[in-house]
Amino acid sequence: EVDDTLKERSSHGSFELPIETYTDNCEIFHSLYNHWHDEMELIYIESGSGLVRLNKEILRVKAGDLIIVNRGVLHGIKTDLKNILYFRSIVFDLNFLSGPAGDLCQERVISLLMENQAEFTHIISPSDSNYENICQLFDAIHTCHKEKNPYYFVKLKALFFSFFYEMLMGNYITPADKEENKSLASIKKI
C-alpha cells in the first residue's frame, strides 16, 4: 500500500532493528508496484530476467545481478513472462548504522548517504569488480537476519559495514546527482 506520493506505508523491521529481509518472485503478480521509501534496499536476482525501474532509469536485469535502491528512489520490478524473476531483498534504515558526530564512518559515509549527497551504483553484475565479495556479504546479511541466532544484531551491523567497505573499495559509492534529486522531489509532491 502506498500514499499519494507513492511512498510505501508499511514499515520494515522494528524501531530497535530497522531491517527486513524478503524472498519473493513475480510468478503470480508479474510486477512489483512502483513505490519509494526512506530505507535503502538491496535486491539480488536469484533467477529469471526482467526490468527494474529506478526513478527515470529502466534497467534490464538477470540472474546474478545485485540492484541497489538508494533511499527515496522510486522503484518497481517487472518480470519477463517467459523467464519469471525470483529474488531476495534486504530493506534497511541507514540509522541502524549511524554513529555519533565525529565518528569517521558517520561523517564520511553514512551521513552523505542519508543526506543524498552520495549514492550507491544502481546495479552490480557478475562481471563487475569485487562482485564476489559483495554478493557473499549480501548473502551473509540475508542469512544472518533470517536465522536470528543469539546476538545476531551485532553480526548484522558488522556485516553491513563490511558490505559498505567492499562497495567503497569497488568505487560503487559516488557523489549524488543533485539536480536529478531536486527534479524527482518535485515529482513526488505532485
Where does each model-flagged region fall?
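Residue-level recognition of conserved beta-strand edge/terminus positions
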Residues: 70-72, 78
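A hydrophobic/aromatic-rich effector-binding and dimerization subdomain
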Residues: 1-20, 78-143
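Short, Lys/Arg-enriched, Trp-marked, Pro/Gly-tolerant hinge/linker segments that flank
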Residues: 120-130, 145-190
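Residues immediately flanking
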Residues: 47, 71, 92-94
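Generic protein-terminus/edge-of-domain signal
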Residues: 1-62, 66, 73, 106-108, ...
